[in-house]
Structure formats: structure tokens, C-alpha cells
């Protein structure tokens, strides 16, 4: 699972996830990509589960790039703890996803296999996604 090696601050405010992705919106490394249509948060576990599903399906063929990184800590207070007494401890990390963001890329496999692999990966993710092909010269 991915997580930052170290962070400047242990905890972050919740914030808002507005707008559409302008950076990371094109297929840059591979030939095919899995692009987010919806918005939301992906936990490090979900990112890893989708990666495993794709890797198992393509069986050593091709190469996969993960274009997102879970860099936002999410804190939780323990169960049955009274309100107050500060913010809870960081429990896991998430990546904030806007519509248009390319999540994964793949190369070295044919399109049919890539579509099947991305469909398996998309089933592991809580947001809507679509299959995209790299645009030549653009």
C-alpha cells in the first residue's frame, strides 16, 4: 500500500473537493487509461486492490502506471469516545479525485485485454470511471 514516507503535519483539515482535474487528465505514459468520471476519495487499500486485480488479469504482460497517490491523512476518533478532547489520530491515507483524472495507465497489451483489466479494477473503486485511449499528437 502507498503512503507518504513522511509528512510536514500529521493531520489535515477536511477541505472540499471541487472542480475538474486539469493536471493528470491525459494519458501520458501508457497506451490505455482508466479515467475518473465521478469525484470522491480513494483510499490506499482501494488503489492497491484495483492494481492487484489488473496485474493478475494481464499475467506478466504489459506495464501498469498508478497516476494517483494517497497523500491526505484521514483521522478517526475511537468508538464510544465522548465529544471534544481534540481531533482523532490519523488512520489511513486517501487520494482526492476530481472528474477527468487519469487513475491508471497500461501499455504492452492489446485493447481487449486492457478493457477487461480496467473493468476488474473499476469494480474495486467507489467512483465511476471510463476507459480512454491515448490521443496521437495531442
Curated annotation (Swiss-Prot):
InterPro entries in UniProt: Ribosomal_uL16, Ribosomal_uL16_bact-type, Ribosomal_uL16_CS, Ribosomal_uL16_dom, Ribosomal_uL16_sf
UniProt entry keywords in alphabetical sequence: Ribonucleoprotein, Ribosomal protein, RNA-binding, rRNA-binding, tRNA-binding
Biased composition (Basic residues): 7-17
Pfam families assigned to the protein according to its UniProt record, in alphabetical order: Ribosomal_L16
Region (Disordered): 1-22
Gene3D superfamilies according to UniProt: Ribosomal protein L10e/L16
CDD domains: Ribosomal_L16_L10e
GO CC annotation: cytosolic large ribosomal subunit
Record GO terms (molecular function): rRNA binding; structural constituent of ribosome; tRNA binding
GO biological process: translation
Task of the protein: Binds 23S rRNA and is also seen to make contacts with the A and possibly P site tRNAs.
Family assignment from sequence similarity: Belongs to the universal ribosomal protein uL16 family.
Subunit: Part of the 50S ribosomal subunit.
Name under which the protein is recorded: Large ribosomal subunit protein uL16
Native species: Nitrosospira multiformis (strain ATCC 25196 / NCIMB 11849 / C 71)
Primary gene name: rplP
